[in-house]
Design a protein with these regions (language model features):
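Membrane-proximal intracellular helices of multi-pass ion channels
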Residues: 1-297
Length: 297
């Protein structure tokens, strides 16, 4: 019982509980298309990958899992990305429980070293940013799938929401077999996904600075300045390196128009930030490009 009163011990317990619950749900017969349910290893691996927003898969998400199974996976990487400790903070606030310094520090560690401060304010920011970014990206993707690709509304909405939540949480899961390779020429699909990944990769401390100080660079904390500067530098280096190495590769950027080449080079400079989507065949990348990906990751 002592672990439940200690946030430092509670965090791994909650993650483990989410993984086990997710694995159990994925083993149910109606979680897979064939109606047989996933094996224990497949279910546990997929659940762990989703909660830890790793994005690694051992079966094709699009064809192996049923609508229920995909819904479970979406819920798992939303929980993982949001941070179970953040949810625990919410439950404590709803119950009227006060939070001391230890709880606030534990919450700060879980959500990318948030500044020790008012838990209510932090929680409100997390909810607001999450719902806003995921909602806006989901709407853009849904409309694009409907208007440009003639998806039925329900199908467009599903794919829009799935990719929006996956992108914001840097999960890398896709409801398409080829990730987003089928949309490598569509900036309306790729750019919102890129921006969502970048926003969440910056972290909530940076968002807090923006909320309190706007775009006043001098008023920002050193952490925010370093984070933003490093992010821009890494994106530029990745973009230039990928474009330079893959520009003439016939299996990746080679056959594309200049604008599409630049778009996909930019997309793949963002994705190593634990996002995991791909608009190009990563297996066809040149060795130097893969090395750059390793460095960026």
């Amino acid at each position: 019982m002592r672990a439940f009163s200690d946030p430092v011990r509670l965090i791994p317990l909650l993650f483990a509980a989410a993984i086990l619950a997710g694995a159990g749900l994925l083993m149910l017969p109606f979680a897979t298309v064939d109606g047989r349910g996933a094996s224990g290893v497949t279910a546990f691996f997929t659940s762990t990958s989703a909660v830890s927003v790793t994005g690694l898969i051992v079966v094709d998400t699009a064809t192996y899992w049923s609508a229920f199974g995909k819904g479970v996976i979406l819920l798992l990487f939303q929980i993982g990305g949001f941070g179970i400790m953040t949810a625990a903070t919410l439950f404590g606030l709803m119950a009227g429980r006060g939070f001391g310094l230890r709880e606030r520090i534990a919450t700060s560690v879980e959500r990318s070293r948030l500044e020790v401060g008012d838990a209510r304010s932090v929680l409100a920011l997390v909810f607001k940013v999450t719902l806003t970014v995921e909602g806006v990206v989901a709407i853009i993707l849904t409309l694009r799938f409907m208007l440009a690709y003639d998806f039925p509304f329900e199908q467009a909405l599903w794919h829009g929401v799935f990719h929006s939540v996956s992108a914001f949480n840097n999960a890398g899961f896709s409801s398409f077999t080829d990730s987003v390779m089928s949309y490598q020429e569509d900036s309306v699909i790729l750019v919102p996904i890129m921006l969502s990944v970048i926003i969440t990769a910056l972290g909530f401390p940076v968002m807090q600075d923006v909320r309190h100080h706007g775009l006043s660079w001098r008023a920002w904390t050193l952490h925010s300045k370093i984070t933003l500067s490093a992010t821009i530098a890494l994106l530029l280096v990745g973009f230039v390196a990928i474009a330079a190495k893959e520009w003439t590769n016939p299996a990746t950027l080679g056959p594309m128009h200049v604008g599409t080449k630049l778009l996909n080079a930019a997309f793949h400079s963002v994705m190593p930030r634990t996002a995991g989507f791909n608009s190009l065949d990563v297996g066809a990348f040149r060795g130097e490009t893969l090395l750059m990906d390793y460095v960026l990751m």
